Amino acid sequence: MTSITRRLFLSLAAALAPGAAAAHHGWGGYDTSKSFTVTGKILKSTFENPHCEIEMEDGGKHWHFVLAPPSRMQARGITADLIAPGKTCTVFGYPHMSKPDEARIEYVILDGKRIELR
């Protein structure tokens, strides 16, 4: 790789990296002044990076909930089986400001046990 090509590649990589990190880790889109709780059956779940996710319904509204990364979930004792479809849980979180069906979850209650995710 020539010196100019290498510098161009490194400059481009450095310029794009912060944007990708901000897009992934930005929680600024969630309104922490409007917390809420939902209890119900899990309809769908994913246990994979970058974040685990579950879908539930409450009062006829379909919700998409963003949980913690799998490594943090496992560190707190939550496995894929505990958030499998058909399981009942309670979530406490904050709604997304521009996506009315999405929320970031702060903690879950599974089998009567409160588990912090952040």
PLM regions and their residue ranges:
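Short aromatic-glycine-enriched beta-strand elements
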Residues: 48-57
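Short nucleic-acid-contacting surface segments enriched for D/E, G, S/T with interspersed K/R
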Residues: 75-90
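OB-fold/S1-family single-stranded nucleic acid-binding modules
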Residues: 97-118
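Short boundary/loop segments of OB/S1/cold-shock single-stranded nucleic-acid-binding domains
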Residues: 22-35
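Conserved hydrophobic positions within beta-strands
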Residues: 40-42
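N-terminal export leaders
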Residues: 6-10
